[in-house]
Amino acid sequence: MTQHDNDPAWPDHKPTALLVLADGTVLEGFGLGAEGHAVGEVCFNTAMTGYEEILTDPSYAGQLITFTFPHIGNVGTNEEDIETVNMAATPGARGVILRTAITDPSNYRATKHLDAWLKARGIIGLSGIDTRALTALIRSKGMPNAVIAHARNGEFDLHGLKEEAREWPGLEGMDLVPMVTSGQRFTWDETPWLWDKGFGQQDKTEFNVVAIDYGIKRNILRLLAGVGCKVTVVPATTSAEDILAMKPDGVFLSNGPGDPAATGKYAVPVIRDVIKSGTPTFGICLGHQMLGLAVGAKTKKMHQGHHGANHPVKDETTGKVEITSMNHGFAVDEKTLPKGATQTHISLFDGSNCGIQLDGKPVFSVQYHPEASPGPRDSHYLFQRFAELMRQKKSA
């Protein structure tokens, strides 16, 4: 699928990187980032900006990201746009697939070239393939398992790579949260970015919030802090007893990678106990899916997933449409939602479930990412909604 004959933009030598799909298809290109190989599920992301935030989102653990936008790397990288909280954990995405070579950065905030940044984080990259054709393949056949490999000398064990891609079990049934969750409890007090000041620092708090870290993003924590939450982040395996002993005004269920049904084996009982306590609860992404499991619904693997910063979502309670940022390959099966759990939001792309509210309880969640980073800010109000639920509970 490489078509670089007579193209001066590409070097005239043998490929230095491969993408080997589980069905035996081999895509040849040119390597960037770290050398080596990695196995994962190939998805595509349609965002035109925010590649650093995407590549450091822990929800992408176990995945190889195909960027549909052709110009990736043109604003460089910096330390402020990283979304990973646990820097000792997996870097998020296992590989990156691009149409064109990375250009030199041109942005006043850039501190490092994307290629050097990928090398430093151990992320393998591949450029020079027809990403439109790869995206079309994913849309028609679903997200394939694959191995991405980079060797500067262009020498590969093709048989071994094909076998590894074929034998990898895939994300279904896989609990990846232990790879990304924080190993210990910590507090967070950084607030959202202001154009002329940068990130702020909390000076006062109104609520005590416990955030369960299934792979939480920094901008979620900033927005919680921005609405007056003193946020204590706890590891994913923290018990309900320990959480409730902290006397939280609210509990937050974070985003994260992998199959919610697998993570739910230890997370769902905790969530059920939190709900029973009457504590206001807000979930995002994986947290939303596990809230669904906690009330008796089921989750399902999606055909191509939702990955991008331009996904329209309808709020069925108001009729309002929000443009949202999404990153998920599993979804709550709306047909299995029990009585007492109301569907509040749906995707206008495919009608899949994007929100739940528990009737008569201060508990709600959304499938998409209201914190964006990257993406639009249409849904920032949900953090205010969470704060209002806690305020009402405290004054009752």
From Swiss-Prot:
Gene3D superfamilies: 3.40.50.880, Carbamoyl-phosphate synthase small subunit, N-terminal domain
GO MF term (any one): ATP binding
Keyword flag Nucleotide-binding: yes
Region CPSase, annotated ranges: 1-204
Domain Glutamine amidotransferase type-1, first and last residues per copy: 208-396
Entries under Pfam families matching the protein: CPSase_sm_chain (PF00988), GATase (PF00117)
Residues annotated as catalytic: 285 (nucleophile), 369, 371
Enzyme category, top tier: ligase
Keyword terms, alphabetized: Amino-acid biosynthesis, Arginine biosynthesis, ATP-binding, Glutamine amidotransferase, Ligase, Nucleotide-binding, Pyrimidine biosynthesis
SMART domains in UniProt: CPSase_sm_chain
GO biological process, one term: L-arginine biosynthetic process
Biological pathway: Amino-acid biosynthesis; L-arginine biosynthesis; carbamoyl phosphate from bicarbonate: step 1/1; Pyrimidine metabolism; UMP biosynthesis via de novo pathway; (S)-dihydroorotate from bicarbonate: step 1/3
Reactions catalysed, as given in the entry: hydrogencarbonate + L-glutamine + 2 ATP + H2O = carbamoyl phosphate + L-glutamate + 2 ADP + phosphate + 2 H(+)
Positions contributing to L-glutamine binding: 59, 256, 258, 286, 289, 327, 329-330
InterPro entries from the UniProt entry: Anth_synth/Amidotransfase, CarbamoylP_synth_ssu, CarbamoylP_synth_ssu_N, CarbP_synth_ssu_N_sf, Class_I_gatase-like, CPSase_GATase1, GATASE
EC number assigned by the record: 6.3.5.5
One cellular component term from this protein's GO annotations in UniProt: carbamoyl-phosphate synthase complex
UniProt family annotation: Belongs to the CarA family.
Function: Small subunit of the glutamine-dependent carbamoyl phosphate synthetase (CPSase). CPSase catalyzes the formation of carbamoyl phosphate from the ammonia moiety of glutamine, carbonate, and phosphate donated by ATP, constituting the first step of 2 biosynthetic pathways, one leading to arginine and/or urea and the other to pyrimidine nucleotides. The small subunit (glutamine amidotransferase) binds and cleaves glutamine to supply the large subunit with the substrate ammonia.
Subunit structure: Composed of two chains; the small (or glutamine) chain promotes the hydrolysis of glutamine to ammonia, which is used by the large (or ammonia) chain to synthesize carbamoyl phosphate. Tetramer of heterodimers (alpha,beta)4.
Protein name, entry field: Carbamoyl phosphate synthase small chain
Source organism of this protein record: Bradyrhizobium diazoefficiens (strain JCM 10833 / BCRC 13528 / IAM 13628 / NBRC 14792 / USDA 110)
